[in-house]
Amino acid sequence: MSATQTAQLMDGTGHARRIVEEAAAKAAEISQRTGTAPCLATVLVGDDPASVTYVRMKRARCAKAGIRSRHIALPATTTTAELIDSLSGLSGDPEVHGILLQHPCGPHIDERAAFEAIAPAKDVDGVTMHSFAAMSFGLPGFVSCTPGGIMRLLEAYDVDLAGKHAVVVGRSAILGKPVGMLLLAKDATVTYCHSRTADLSAMVREADVVVAAVGRPRLIRGEDIKPGAVVIDAGYNPGNVGDVDFDAVLTRARLITPVPGGVGPMTIAVLLEQTVDAAANQLGVQQ
């Protein structure tokens, strides 16, 4: 790319809308055929303002897509054992088809133990070890929603990953690690980077595809990006700022996701899609 060219924006909002419209049509069909609408249970521990906002947003999106939502608000003093009891109850409730535990839950909660209380058939957020293993082996199951949304966006823009060098900056269990596995499944050569990586900039400069998912505002600079690279900014920091220095990268990348309007809407769209799929599976509706 020349210095005067700018990257094409990857429109997560528009592509997410199409996914949600398809999910809504499937939800309506399920309701018509079974008399039961798909149901997503959201579980929130405490009253962190950002988490409250995220849950409210997800429930609103459910309503627009014809998905029922059941909200369980637990006090900040909830113990891991109490949270596990709540999640186990929802896992055994036939009226609930998907379960979302909003995280982080607080430093006193063993989140991994809590996630594992979610039945795999209802793990529509793709957070359990079962879901990660199924995804890694290419078996049926639910993917982590943000990685799933990223892959759908890459597909929508016809990004050929075979033989490409993809650098994932971040190694969280629900974003960095799974998106790397999904990229690998598309025949990309994947490098993971993290807080202990020596000379991060040099690593990123070798990438054909960059996924920034570390939660550090503007960590990825313009000079870090190979001209013509595809840049996925999965970070979201205060002030609507991602992990990528957007303005600086805009004149070097070929494709880039904006923040907001890129990865975020795709994450919610995949959550709704997987909730509908979970309901279809549990209610015996072939799609």
Curated annotation (Swiss-Prot):
It comes from the Bacteria. It catalyses: (6R)-5,10-methylene-5,6,7,8-tetrahydrofolate + NADP(+) = (6R)-5,10-methenyltetrahydrofolate + NADPH; (6R)-5,10-methenyltetrahydrofolate + H2O = (6R)-10-formyltetrahydrofolate + H(+). NADP(+) binds at residues 170-172, 195. GO terms for biological process: L-histidine biosynthetic process; methionine biosynthetic process; purine nucleotide biosynthetic process; tetrahydrofolate interconversion. Transmembrane segments: none annotated. Keywords: Amino-acid biosynthesis, Histidine biosynthesis, Hydrolase, Methionine biosynthesis, Multifunctional enzyme, NADP, One-carbon metabolism, Oxidoreductase, Purine biosynthesis. InterPro entries: Aminoacid_DH-like_N_sf, NAD(P)-bd_dom_sf, THF_DH/CycHdrlase, THF_DH/CycHdrlase_cat_dom, THF_DH/CycHdrlase_CS, THF_DH/CycHdrlase_NAD-bd_dom. Pathway: One-carbon metabolism; tetrahydrofolate interconversion. It holds the Pfam family THF_DHG_CYH. GO terms for molecular function: methenyltetrahydrofolate cyclohydrolase activity; methylenetetrahydrofolate dehydrogenase (NADP+) activity. PROSITE patterns: THF_DHG_CYH_2 (PS00767). The keyword Isomerase does not apply. The keyword ATP-binding does not apply. One of its GO terms (cellular component) is cytosol. SUPFAM superfamilies: Aminoacid dehydrogenase-like, N-terminal domain, NAD(P)-binding Rossmann-fold domains. Its EC number is 1.5.1.5, 3.5.4.9. Belongs to the tetrahydrofolate dehydrogenase/cyclohydrolase family. Catalyzes the oxidation of 5,10-methylenetetrahydrofolate to 5,10-methenyltetrahydrofolate and then the hydrolysis of 5,10-methenyltetrahydrofolate to 10-formyltetrahydrofolate. Homodimer. This is Bifunctional protein FolD 1. It comes from Streptomyces avermitilis (strain ATCC 31267 / DSM 46492 / JCM 5070 / NBRC 14893 / NCIMB 12804 / NRRL 8165 / MA-4680). The lineage of its organism: Bacteria, Bacillati, Actinomycetota, Actinomycetes, Kitasatosporales. The gene is folD1.
